[in-house]
Amino acid sequence: MSEKAFVTVTALTKYIKRKFDVDPHLEDIWIKGELSNVKIHSRGHVYFTLKDENARMQAVMFQRSAAKLPFSPKSGMKVFVRGGIQVYEPSGNYQLYAKEMQPDGVGALHLAYEELKKKLASEGLFDARYKKPIPEYPEVVGVITSPTGAAVRDVITTINRRYQQAKIIVLPALVQGEHATRSIVERIKEANEKQLCDVLIVGRGGGSIEELWAFNEEAVARAIFASDIPIISAVGHETDFTISDFTADMRAPTPTGAAELAVPSTTDLIERIKSIDIRLTRAVKNQTSQAKDRLLALQSSYAFRFPKRLQEQKEQQFDLVFDRFQKQLTRQIEQKRSQLDRQTYRLKPLHPKEQLLQAKKRHANETEQLIRSMNVQMKTIHSQFQSVLGKLNALNPLQVMERGYSLAYKEDELIKSVNQVETKDQLTITMKDGRLICEVIEKEGQSS
């Protein structure tokens, strides 16, 4: 067999892949099936198997598409998947590269309902702390519903029967179909912006989940939550629960029930007024009877029979109390005065004037002591000075001259020996009262 009769696995796989790539029916296709082996990668990619009763195929949805899904894919879900079929060359298998995914049929609505309910609950839109109280006696009741349905007739009839004082404003809105969500949201905003009423009833009669779906839309739920006017939700029958029921300030099982919650019953109010009137009449009678008994008791009392004597007794009691008070006050004043004197005595040494006086006394004493000490020291110094002066005088040449001695100088040099002079030397003789200029005629004494 020639080599041309054979192809490689790679070549065949590439050939098949090209066939898939150029087929317009496989490039963008919707496939219905059941999810199986769903695995969500850490990077956000979703790998799964799409199957029915007779076949299965591998599929992948990359993170950029998976991030847009309004729900979390799980095994067992019936879904519609949109994407393209391509061949994965390494394994030779074909697989679906998914771009969109939607739950199948009614199951999709239930899934979307649960997903939105979970989302809004996590944001706190259902929390009781945000619920506004329904006014007890509203003057104006607003009704957002279809103007031609049975629901609006039931609400109007019930309010007129129960509480004719309330004015009813019907804000007509679409309650099913493609434009119902926008219509309901606009009516809620209009009622708030124009402050049309004291309480709002938002709802409709019963129907299938598809017909009631506008009240499960996120936009309607958020408009109800944002409303400043308290809202009563009344959608469908008693067993029907919508997202609007959870975000509303109060939920009614039916439109008729909403009307009963919105306004009080005039009959009930009349009965309540009658009951209050009976209780008030009985209370007034009881209080009047008790007051009459107290008055009779007072009239028969000692004070009414002998008022002057009672006055005299009270005056005596007042005098006694006044005397005790005066004595106690005097005693307290004396105690306070004694305490003040003691405090004054203790504080006197601390008074600046007293401290200044004491400082002056200390200064005078210290000055006197300093003067005495200085006098003693001066006397001692004077005595020492006289002693030193006497010694100095004893050594003073002038003092020696006073006793008849003189000093001889040769050219300003004191002559202490005859050996310092020669015959005919000129000498200066200093005496106590002057000097003599002499010439040596002869010298006597021992020569050195």
Curated annotation (Swiss-Prot):
Q: Which reaction is this enzyme known to catalyze?
A: Exonucleolytic cleavage in either 5'- to 3'- or 3'- to 5'-direction to yield nucleoside 5'-phosphates
* Keywords tagged on the record: Cytoplasm, Exonuclease, Hydrolase, Nuclease
Q: Which GO terms of the cellular component aspect does the record hold?
A: cytoplasm; exodeoxyribonuclease VII complex
- Write down the InterPro entries for this protein, in alphabetical order: Exonuc_VII_L (IPR003753), Exonuc_VII_lsu_C (IPR020579), OB-fold_nuc-bd_dom (IPR025824)
Source species, domain of life: Bacteria
Where primarily located?
cytoplasm
Q: Which GO terms describe its biological process?
A: DNA catabolic process
Q: What is its EC number?
A: 3.1.11.6
Subcellular location, record wording: Cytoplasm
The top EC class is hydrolase
The record's GO molecular-function terms, alphabetically, read: exodeoxyribonuclease VII activity; nucleic acid binding
Q: Which NCBIfam families match?
A: xseA (TIGR00237)
**Which PANTHER family does the entry mention?**
EXODEOXYRIBONUCLEASE 7 LARGE SUBUNIT
Which proteins does it associate with, and in what oligomeric form?
Heterooligomer composed of large and small subunits.
**Task of the protein:** Bidirectionally degrades single-stranded DNA into large acid-insoluble oligonucleotides, which are then degraded further into small acid-soluble oligonucleotides.
Q: What family name appears in the similarity comment?
A: Belongs to the XseA family.
Q: What is the name attached to this protein's record?
A: Exodeoxyribonuclease 7 large subunit
Q: Which organism is it from?
A: Bacillus pumilus (strain SAFR-032)
